[in-house]
């Protein structure tokens, strides 16, 4: 990895914002002749045939809904900034969901500002414009275009996103001087928040965050299409993993993680969350993302993974697979119990149902099996009332899905967990049973077995649709599917 050099101060650059400098470059400095040479000889690369983003109509409608909810108030929605990984390297950037949802843009340091007018709001997207060739920023700044790639010009950005664009470097000063009521989405851009520190309140800002979260509870057609794309790529990623299980046995869970990641990067933007590639007793650790354990024949592999599309929509799918292609009798018994619980949960997903219904339906089946197996004393109603099944079921049976894997997290309880399902909602149904390796309350043969089955379910007008139905779920179908992929 190369290192950017330091821009010398000249009369032309002395009053400008300093270029970000990186230390310890091999060149001691920049001669006046080189600095002058780098100013010219560059072709005009302005893009004139840009088309609007595919979701331009949807993002405009979302901004209109936001405007209607907060008339007369200035609204500030930042994308966020790069975060340092180490020294002068950064983590890959992912824009705030609120910003991406309203604009379609994914650029660091971007800010959407909606200025109140007599009939709504005037929208402006603030971005960093093209690198300036005159002051050397494009080649001497570590974030200049020569180092990290070409940016859109402001004119190009307007064409792509359908929003007037301005230079973000002018925004903080303008916000400091602004008057009138204002709300900001917090937690993404400290500089913007500092500029508004005496103009905003936590209570009003939280109302904005909650509203933006609840807007995403019901997905539009574009979002549903993106979620289906994410799921379809995820299915192919699971197929990839099955084909390399023999190689994973020779290495570790990391091989599985890397195999799925390749599919996510080839067909999408990234993985939607840290892949859980949990073999053997690691399947009993709900968020096992270290993925550094062995993969052994005879064990189960719990793979919980999802591809994220280029528009940030993610799948979230789990299958629990026999490493050698066939479940043992006990593994099958536990797996089939989880399958039956998931079937009951999915059947409860329909418009007008309470959000909690699918969780309750799945938990009842699991409690029945635990009583049947003699692992907990019945009757089932007592087990459910006291929550005794939770020693082995551990987690809720699902969550909303969208641009965040756990989507709409800021929504109010009454609209989410205590709410009612509506057509267009997308959620996961993911019951599980987990018998910890050190659980002395169950027979030894159960210990270290963990099973989860998870699918992405769309609420439709007359019921539901399993977006991930292309991946087999029944134990016999899983075995046949694996055999076909392994040849």
Where on the chain are the PLM-derived regions?
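Active-site neighborhoods and metal-handling regions in enzymes and metal-associated proteins
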Residues: 1-487
């Amino acid at each position: 990895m190369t290192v950017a050099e330091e821009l010398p101060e000249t009369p032309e650059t002395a009053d400008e914002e300093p270029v970000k400098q990186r230390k310890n470059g091999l060149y001691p400095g920049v001669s006046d002749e080189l600095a002058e040479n780098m100013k010219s000889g560059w072709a005009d690369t302005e893009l004139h045939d840009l088309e609007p983003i595919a979701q331009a109509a949807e993002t405009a409608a979302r901004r209109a809904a936001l405007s209607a909810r907060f008339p007369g108030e200035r609204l500030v929605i930042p994308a966020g900034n790069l975060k340092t990984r180490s020294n002068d390297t950064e983590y890959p950037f992912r824009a705030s969901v609120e910003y991406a949802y309203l604009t379609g843009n994914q650029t660091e340091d971007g800010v959407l500002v909606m200025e109140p007018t007599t009939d709504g709001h005037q929208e402006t997207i603030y971005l960093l414009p093209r690198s300036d060739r005159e002051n050397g920023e494009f080649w001497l700044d570590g974030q200049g275009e020569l180092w990290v790639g070409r940016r859109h010009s402001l004119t190009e950005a307007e064409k792509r996103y359908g929003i007037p664009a301005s230079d973000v470097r002018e925004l903080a000063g303008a916000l400091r001087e602004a008057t009138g009521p204002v709300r900001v989405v917090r937690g993404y851009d400290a500089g913007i928040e500092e500029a508004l520190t005496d103009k905003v309140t936590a209570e009003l800002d939280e109302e904005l965050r909650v509203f933006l979260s609840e807007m995403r509870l019901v997905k539009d057609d574009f979002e549903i299409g993106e979620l289906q794309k994410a799921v379809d790529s995820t299915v192919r990623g699971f197929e990839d993993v099955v084909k390399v299980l023999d190689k994973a046995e020779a290495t570790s869970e990391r091989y599985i993680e890397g195999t799925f990641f390749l599919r996510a990067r080839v067909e999408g933007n990234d993985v939607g969350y840290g892949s859980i590639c949990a073999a053997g007793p690691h399947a009993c650790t709900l968020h096992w993302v270290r993925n550094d354990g062995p993969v052994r024949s005879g064990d189960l592999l719990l793979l919980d993974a999802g591809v994220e599309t280029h528009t940030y929509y993610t799948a979230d799918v789990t299958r629990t697979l026999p490493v050698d292609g066939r479940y043992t009798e006990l593994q099958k018994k536990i797996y089939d119990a989880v399958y039956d619980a998931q079937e009951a949960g999915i059947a409860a997903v329909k418009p007008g149902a309470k959000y909690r219904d699918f969780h309750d339906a799945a938990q009842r089946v699991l409690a029945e099996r635990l009583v049947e197996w003699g692992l907990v004393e019945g009757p089932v109603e007592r087990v459910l009332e006291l929550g005794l099944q939770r020693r082995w079921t551990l987690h809720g049976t699902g969550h909303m899905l969208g641009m965040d894997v756990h989507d709409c997290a800021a929504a109010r309880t009454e609209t989410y967990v205590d709410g009612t399902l509506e057509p267009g909602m997308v959620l996961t149904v993911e019951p599980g049973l987990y018998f910890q390796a050190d659980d002395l309350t169950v027979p030894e043969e159960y210990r270290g077995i963990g099973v989860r089955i998870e699918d992405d379910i769309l609420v439709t007008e007359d019921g539901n649709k399993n977006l991930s139905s292309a991946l087999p779920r029944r134990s016999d179908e899983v075995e046949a599917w694996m055999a076909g992929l392994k040849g």
